[in-house]
């Protein structure tokens, strides 16, 4: 923090520091709108209020807990749980109250600018300080006494307002950059999904309708992963496959995992399909030999009937996923049984056409993955820039 700014406690800067209570403890019910808007820690984002799922309580709650009735401009900070220290300003005119997980910091407007305080409490330095002072009982929490005694650097009001103005402008530019990156990624995903569906809903000349059982099979048998010959083979479970992408994560050998129950052998010619929770769309093309969980189907494509790449994309298609989900729903269990899997019917082109279509899908998928990677990099860079700006602001360097 800047050495040139005086220090003040929040107890001296706020006319009220308090928190709410639980309606259930007070004998009140949650109600449908209209009622008293009831703010919980879920509604307090970082520098923004989140009301996609608002809650309401009986009007009489405000008579019982009048101390925590909100006013426009109140600084709200989360006192409990994973979002501890997350701070935003209540920017609505709705009559509202809060629960025990949210604290009110009602500033004296002639002493501290509420938006300056919100930015300060959301800064990396103060987030770290708040976490250092958590009291870990059943859930991490911060006390009102801690906030009353919390010392903050306090530049003159005009300087506070200037700093907020600079941060507002900078953060607006960052939000625009983030929105543009997200839009580019959404467009790429939409293009891939559109092309994927167009491939698997068309029926060209010479295409033949076939069941999955006509074009692939499960040829593997269960083996004991404790045997020496299998111990150093890589194991793939549903948790090791990324949804919709087919990427592998956190792979280990049978020895490293200490596997006991039976597993299927697979090789590089197969497609792995997770039969558990088909809506997750976990399908993969391994480029190695290994073992897979009994909750997966190692599918061997039939030569001259279907290519491995075409089978991979077919199992990721919307039509197959809907079919798989419907089958698991009828069975009353979130998994696809073998009989239902192989009964799936689809119009298939010749192998040459399959190779062409699968190649096009792979190219689009690679481009989508590239944009996904760029998006993640940009997100990380923007987050780092935000932290840097907040740090510079409260060091007096803006």
Which residue stretches match the model-derived regions?
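Non-catalytic DNA-recognition/assembly elements of restriction-modification systems
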Residues: 1-21, 149-165, 172, 176, ...
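A short glycine-rich beta-alpha junction/loop motif
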Residues: 3, 29, 79-80, 95-103, ...
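Short, ligand-facing micro-motifs at secondary-structure edges
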Residues: 44-56, 75-99, 115, 119, ...
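Short, surface-exposed loop/turn microsegments at beta-strand edges and helix-strand junctions
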Residues: 27-36, 48-57, 67-70, 88-100, ...
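Short, conserved charged micro-motifs
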Residues: 111-115, 305-309, 355
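Sequence-specific dsDNA recognition surfaces
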Residues: 11-27, 42-72, 213-225, 236-268
């Amino acid at each position: 923090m800047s050495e040139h700014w005086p220090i003040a406690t929040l107890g001296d800067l706020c006319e009220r520091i308090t928190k709410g209570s639980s309606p259930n403890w007070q004998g009140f019910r949650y109600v449908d709108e209209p009622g008293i808007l009831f703010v919980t820690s879920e509604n307090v984002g970082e520098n923004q209020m989140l009301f996609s799922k608002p809650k309401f309580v009986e009007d009489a709650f405000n008579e019982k807990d009048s101390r925590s009735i909100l006013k426009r401009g109140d600084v709200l900070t989360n006192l409990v749980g994973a979002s501890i220290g997350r701070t935003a300003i209540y920017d609505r005119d709705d009559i509202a109250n809060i629960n025990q997980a949210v604290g009110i910091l009602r500033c004296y407007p002639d002493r501290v600018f509420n938006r300056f305080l919100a930015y300060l409490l959301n800064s990396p330095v103060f987030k770290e300080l708040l976490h250092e002072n958590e009291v870990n009982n059943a859930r991490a929490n911060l006390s009102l006494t801690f906030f009353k005694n919390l010392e903050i650097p306090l530049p003159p009001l005009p300087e506070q307002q200037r700093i907020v103005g600079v941060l507002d402008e900078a953060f607006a530019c960052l939000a625009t950059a983030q929105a543009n990156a997200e839009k580019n990624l959404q467009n790429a995903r939409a293009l891939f999904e559109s092309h994927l569906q167009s491939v698997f809903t068309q029926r060209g000349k010479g295409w033949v309708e076939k069941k999955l059982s006509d074009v692939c099979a499960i040829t593997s048998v269960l083996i004991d992963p404790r045997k020496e010959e299998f111990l150093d083979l890589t194991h793939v479970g549903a948790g090791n496959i990324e949804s919709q992408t087919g990427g592998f994560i956190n792979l280990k050998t049978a020895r490293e995992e200490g596997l006991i129950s039976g597993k299927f052998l697979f090789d590089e010619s197969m497609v792995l399909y997770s039969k558990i929770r088909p809506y997750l769309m976990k399908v993969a093309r391994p480029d190695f030999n290994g073992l897979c969980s009994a909750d997966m189907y190692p599918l061997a494509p039939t030569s001259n009937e279907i290519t491995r790449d075409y089978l991979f994309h077919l199992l990721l298609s919307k039509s197959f996923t809907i079919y798989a989900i419907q089958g698991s729903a009828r069975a009353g269990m979130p998994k696809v049984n073998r009989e239902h899997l192989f009964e799936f019917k689809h119009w298939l082109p010749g192998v040459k056409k399959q190779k062409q279509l699968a190649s096009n899908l792979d190219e689009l998928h690679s481009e989508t993955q590239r944009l996904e990677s760029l998006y993640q990099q940009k997100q990380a860079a923007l987050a780092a820039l935000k932290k840097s700006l907040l740090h510079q602001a409260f060091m007096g360097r803006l």
